[in-house]
Structures are given as structure tokens and as C-alpha cells.
Amino acid sequence: MTSIKLIMRPYILAETNWKAVKQAEFQVAVLPWGATEAHNYHLPYGTDNVLADRIAAEAAKIAFSRGGKVIVLPAIPFGVNTGQPDVKFDMNLNPGTQFMILKDLITVLDRQEIHKLVILNTHGGNDFKQMIRELNLLFPKMFICQCNWFKIPGGENYFEDMGEHAGEVETSFMQYLIPELVLPLSEAGEGKARIFRVAALNEGWAWAERRWTQVTKDTGIGNPALATAGKGEIFFKLITEKIGEFLFELSVVPPDEFYKEKS
């Protein structure tokens, strides 16, 4: 039986050790935050968590290789799923609970003078903006931001249907990253989604939470039919390069020099 030798990555907190950590300097902590929920019929419940772990690790690797003093914290595997109470095992953390988790973790970082935190979000139901505003008042020395990989532009160059949830993009990622957990696409639903009858709610300037099972029959929004591992690999490398560069820049910029004159 052949054993697989694992190599410790010094920028992943769960893999490193006190001997290494106590003498190292860190400028940026990365907190991956996913969700546990159904992803159409063909993707695992932990899709967002796989993406959180893999994207954070690869981006941190890129930043670390350039000299960025970055550390990735263990991912939070549960997110806001208040619109899906009738989907079995769609686990929910209320925003207030998320705030308390962040407050406790930031208390540790602030005490230890790691004053830059990136919440790397992989779940559309999570929105940390208002929490960050409140936390900024509580921790004036901290720089806290959220990073949503799905907001990074460029996917339209590789995917026919960008979708929202368990569609071509996420399926391609999972086919590339962990194909053994992806069912054949012949078993996937089409990811058809109903829209609001009220036009403003579809135009983005008015908002209401969607009742998920009234919108989609298979829990997906976006057709995964054209997904391929090749597309997933290309776009994964694109977004992790962008996030890696972001983490590096954030690591090296002095805390009192975040702003500059607009050219």
C-alpha cells in the first residue's frame, strides 16, 4: 500500500504548529466562510466549503510565495440559509450569530496585533457588510473586509450560463477540484428558476429574500449542462491569482496608508 506524504503549508493554520507560528510574523488573517446546503441533485452539500478551503489555500499560497505574511484560519462551514428552511439539512446561521462569531475571533486577532482580516466568502446568502461596519466601531485598529469570489469578473468569457447556484460555474469548479463527489450531469436538474412577479424586485433596486423552493425545484439556479473540469481549472486559476494578489497587496500596505490620491 502506497502512503501519501503530506507537506505542511506554513500559511494554513490548521496544518502549521506552535514552533513555527510563535516566531513568524503575520499581517493578514483569512477567514474562509462557506455554507452547508443542497446544490442541485449532483453536487455535494459541502460545495461552498470545498471552494472556501481550496480558494483560500491557493490564494494564500500565491500571496505567501511573493512575500505576503498571510495565514488562513479554519473555514466556517455554515452560512445564512433563512430562505431554505424546508430543504433538508440546509443548515442556517443567522446573521446575528455570524456577528458574534466574528466578534469573538476578531477579539483574538486584535489582541495579538494581527490587524487585517479578510472574510473570504463563498456563499451568496452571506453578507458581512453591515457586520463589518459595526465591528469597525468596536475594533478601530482592525481593517476588516469581505471578498466574494463570485463577484470577480471574467467568467462570462468561459461559461455560457453564469447562473447563481450549482450551475455551470460551481459544477466546473467541483469537476476540477474534487470530481469523485460530482454525480454525472445526466442526473443533474436543469436549474430553472422562477422570478418575482413584481418587476422592481428583478431589477436589483428593490430586494426581498427568495423562498427557495418556490423558485427552483432542484435547488439549483443555473444550468450545469455545459460544465467541464477544463473550464473549472481555467477560472479557478484566474480567481485565485486575483485574490492572491489582493492578499499580497493587503499584507504589504502600511495600516495608515490605505488611501491615496486618485490619478
Q: Where are the model-predicted features located?
A:
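Extended, histidine- and acidic-residue-enriched regions that form the cofactor-binding/catalytic faces
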Residues: 2-117, 122-263
